[in-house]
């Protein structure tokens, strides 16, 4: 789907999706899709939502 990017509030714990950046920083909370949406948000949605 879309590449997940960490929100500013969660910039400390970077939760990137597979192949996005360093998978070593991947957290279990971001592994699941439901929690991933909370910590990371799709890139195309952030720009298309308020533009």
UniProtKB/Swiss-Prot annotation:
Single Gene Ontology BP term?
A: chromosome condensation
Question: Can you say where in the cell this protein is located?
Answer: Nucleus; Chromosome
GO molecular function terms listed in the Swiss-Prot or TrEMBL record: DNA binding
Origin superkingdom: Eukaryota
Tell me which InterPro entries the record gives.
Protamine_P1
One Pfam family name from the record?
Answer: Protamine_P1
- What is any one of the record's Gene Ontology cellular component terms? nucleosome
Q: Specify whether Phosphoprotein is a keyword of the entry.
A: no
Family under the similarity heading? Belongs to the protamine P1 family.
Q: What is the protein's known function?
A: Protamines substitute for histones in the chromatin of sperm during the haploid phase of spermatogenesis. They compact sperm DNA into a highly condensed, stable and inactive complex.
What does the subunit comment say? Cross-linked by interchain disulfide bonds around the DNA-helix.
Question: What is the protein's given name?
Answer: Sperm protamine P1
Gene that this sequence comes from: PRM1
